[in-house]
Amino acid sequence: MLIVNPFATATSPAGRDALAHTLSAHFHLDVELTTHRGHAFELAARAAAEDFDTVIVHGGDGSVNEAANGLLDPPSRSDPDRGRPALAVIPGGSANVFARTLGIDPDPLLATQQIITLLDAGESRRIGLGHTDDRWFLFNTGMGMDAVVVHAMEDKRHAGKTATPARYLWTTITSFLKQSGSSATFDVEIPGRDRIIGARFGFVSNTSPWTYLGPREIRTNPDTGFHTGLGVFVATSTGVLRNLPLATKLLSQADPKARHLFRDDDVDEVCFHAEAPIDVQMDGDYIGAFRDIRFRHRRDALTVIAPPISIPETTT
């Protein structure tokens, strides 16, 4: 099944027709266009129920997240031994973080050929996913600053403005300056660790990189990957002077360290607790404001059509 979001930023009717024609020349293909939010979830769930071999999503990260959640049962009752269709991605959004992290070509037509080659060769791999009690995430979730940015960007898209790297950067800067005077904080709990008090923003990553500034990779948790647990990146300050050196390290891909920063690249569980609801985003979609939210990791949760990766050897 090919699920296409016709409203995604980088899709066009001609491009969609070309990649659908190319795929249908190689495989029996059911093409479905999404018409509303949540439709990719519904279509992927149908594909799982009807025993499709593979679901290919041509759209942005939001559509891919919906499809992944449709392919899998909710985390609270997921059966890891139950067969599910594999997930493949042809980039169609503005960021395409998940596809880029998997090693999929950013050009949709080249990505289509890449997916065909991988399917013909039987290439697939299992990846771990992060989740709350009722929802899976593919690459990142967060409370505080990044969720504020995502919320602001969604408002701008609804107002008819295109999501571009420059607009994301400007929205991030202005949101950061606005939030620097905010008193909203939350605490962070990781089993076996001291409680982190007064966090201002926190990222929970399922892989790295999970964010980009145009073509530049930003790695908040360099050692986190689909083969590890979750990465946690929590800052207890939004002060500009304290965060400028940290931002410089992130932009230069140096090891991100700071006195006001807690970082761990491999945990199985993390909980955020706030006195008042704070914005939360998941895979680049704003999901609401929460006081308490828990994130866990599930290894080998999803089969993806993607190039193989070399996992660094560990020494003991």
Language-model-detected regions and their locations in the chain:
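Short conserved active-site loop signatures built around small residues
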Residues: A40, D61, G122, G202
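Glycine-rich phosphate/pyrophosphate-binding beta-alpha loops
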Residues: G142, D146, F203-R219, Y286
